[in-house]
Amino acid sequence: MNFIKSSLILGGAGLLIGAGTIYFGLIHPGADEPHSALVFKLIETTRDRAIAVRADDLVVPALTDPAMIKQGAGNYAAMCVGCHLAPGIESTEMSKILYPAPPNLAKLGAPDPARAFWVIKHGVKASGMAAWGTNMKDDYI
């Protein structure tokens, strides 16, 4: 009985703290003020795990096809360089102001292809990463 009572009290306290945090606006929503380390880690871990779970069963096409590489390079130059940069481009107006900062893909190296495809297709909420799959067929992503 003590366990149930303690669990209910702790659960209720957690709900009150969470509701108070939301109601009193304790988490700053502005992109010009970074999250606390704890909030950033929670968001980052949640995002990474959610993408991994959803990308786990994707079948990745042969990424060594020269035509696919050429098409991908053109799409990247047209739609991605402004935020994710390219070799020889250190920063842009857009890459300087986004929070969280988009990864510099020229320095990051090759990401997991299935996860990269999922992110490009579906985007990431509240990050500035567009869901390109809403107006591009999978063959172009």
Where do the PLM segments sit?
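Periplasmic c-type cytochrome electron-transfer domains
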Residues: 2-74, 94, 108-115, 131-141
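Soluble periplasmic/extracytoplasmic beta-strand elements of cell-envelope proteins
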Residues: 104-106
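Periplasmic/extracellular electron-transfer cofactor-ligation site
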Residues: 73-100, 125-131
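Glycine-rich, acidic and aromatic/proline-enriched surface loops and short helix-turn segments
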Residues: 122
